[in-house]
Amino acid sequence: MKLTCVMIVAVLFLTAWTFATADDPRNGLGNLFSNAHHEMKNPEASKLNKRWCKQSGEMCNLLDQNCCEGYCIVLVCT
């Protein structure tokens, strides 16, 4: 009996926590799909195109390989 009560309280708590921490409970998936569709129609609106990268001759990071073109060799983009 105690275990059943604990389980019911836990489920109610987790359900309330899920709704309380949701970003936008009203039409959340609709807004997500709408934004994705807009980015497909207008590729320049995509966040992926706003990638920060280094041009040739600039200092770079060997771990991230953050050169726009070429490779990061001896901390300089080639």
Curated annotation (Swiss-Prot):
SUPFAM superfamilies according to UniProt: omega toxin-like
Sorted UniProt keywords: Cleavage on pair of basic residues, Disulfide bond, Ion channel impairing toxin, Knottin, Neurotoxin, Secreted, Signal, Toxin, Voltage-gated sodium channel impairing toxin
InterPro entries given in the database record: Conotoxin, Conotoxin_d-typ_CS
Signal sequence interval, chain numbering: 1-22
An MF annotation (GO) of this entry: sodium channel inhibitor activity
Entry's localization field: Secreted
Propeptide: 23-49
Disulfide bond entries: 53-68, 60-72, 67-77
Domain of life assignment: Eukaryota
Any single GO CC term annotated in Swiss-Prot or TrEMBL for this entry: extracellular region
Tissue expression per record: Expressed by the venom duct.
Biological function: Delta-conotoxins bind to site 6 of voltage-gated sodium channels (Nav) and inhibit the inactivation process.
Domain remark in the UniProt entry: The presence of a 'disulfide through disulfide knot' structurally defines this protein as a knottin. The cysteine framework is VI/VII (C-C-CC-C-C).
Family membership noted in the UniProt record: Belongs to the conotoxin O1 superfamily.
Designated name of the protein: Delta-conotoxin-like Ai6.1
Organism: Conus ammiralis (Admiral cone)
